[in-house]
Structure formats: structure tokens, C-alpha cells
């Protein structure tokens, strides 16, 4: 089954569409690998918590040796530095499009390994047992700069 077909199969009403749309939005960007995709989704999620005080989609990030990973993303795309190729960008709300564009602008020049290593030294990852807690992410990144 192709990545596009699997994502289409996952579509559900409400917030799950935002999960799929966010994954598709980043995956449609030129030069995006699965590792970078996971990292960008992580940063979009945490900055969404900070800027909008809500979850932008039902991501669940696990502590793995690679960094914070939503297992659904790694199931679809694997964990590699192979470039992902996907079709057109999905249509998003203006608020979500603005956030994802900001994340892309800030982090797209870095490779996925660098972004994951960076996340691994931050409190929410270093203190997690298994699942990174949204509360820990919000508290840490509320005090961190986007730099």
C-alpha cells in the first residue's frame, strides 16, 4: 500500500484529519525525509501547544533512540534519510497553515538527525519514561525561545 493510500485510509472526522493533513503538508515539501518529517511534526505540535494553547492534532510522541516519534508516522514512512515524495499539499485552516509555514521556515534548513538530537536534550524528552507528556512540552517550550 502506498503512503498516500495509507494516509487516505486513516482519515477520520475531526482532529484526525488535522493529523493526516499536517503529515501530508510536511511530506509534500521538497527534501523531507521520514526522520525530518517526525521532527517537524514534533515541533509543530509543541509550538501549537504554546502559541494556541491546544493540541493541533492527536499526535502521541514516544521516547525512542531516534528522538520523539509518533509511531503512526514511522509505520507509514519508516525511519530513514530517504527523501519522501508526496503529491500536493492539503488544504488547511489559515491558523494551521501559518503555524506549519513558521515551523518550515525555522527548521527546514536542518536535517532530521540534527532536529531529533536537539529535541532529545530538552526536558520533555529527557524526562519521559515512554510517552512525552503534552503538559511537560507546554511548560518547557513556553519558556524556551524558538531559536
Predicted regions and their residues:
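Domain-edge interaction signal
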Residues: 1-147
Amino acid at each position: 500500500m502506498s503512503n498516500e493510500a495509507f494516509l487516505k485510509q486513516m482519515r477520520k472526522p475531526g482532529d484526525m484529519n488535522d493529523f493526516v493533513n499536517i503529515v501530508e503538508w510536511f511530506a509534500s515539501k521538497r527534501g523531507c525525509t521520514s526522520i525530518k518529517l517526525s521532527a517537524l511534526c514534533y515541533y509543530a505540535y509543541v509550538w501549537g501547544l504554546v502559541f494556541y494553547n491546544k493540541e493541533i492534532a492527536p499526535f502521541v510522541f514516544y521516547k525512542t533512540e531516534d528522538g520523539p516519534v509518533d509511531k503512526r508516522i514511522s509505520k507509514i514512512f519508516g525511519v530513514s534519510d530517504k527523501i519522501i515524495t508526496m503529491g500536493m499539499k492539503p488544504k488547511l485552516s489559515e491558523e494551521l497553515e501559518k503555524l506549519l509555514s513558521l515551523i518550515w521556515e525555522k527548521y527546514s534548513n536542518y536535517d532530521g538527525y540534527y532536529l531529533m538530537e536537539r529535541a532529545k536534550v530538552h526536558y520533555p524528552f529527557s524526562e519521559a519514561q515512554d510517552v512525552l507528556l503534552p503538559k511537560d512540552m507546554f511548560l518547557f517550550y513556553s519558556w524556551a525561545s524558538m531559536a
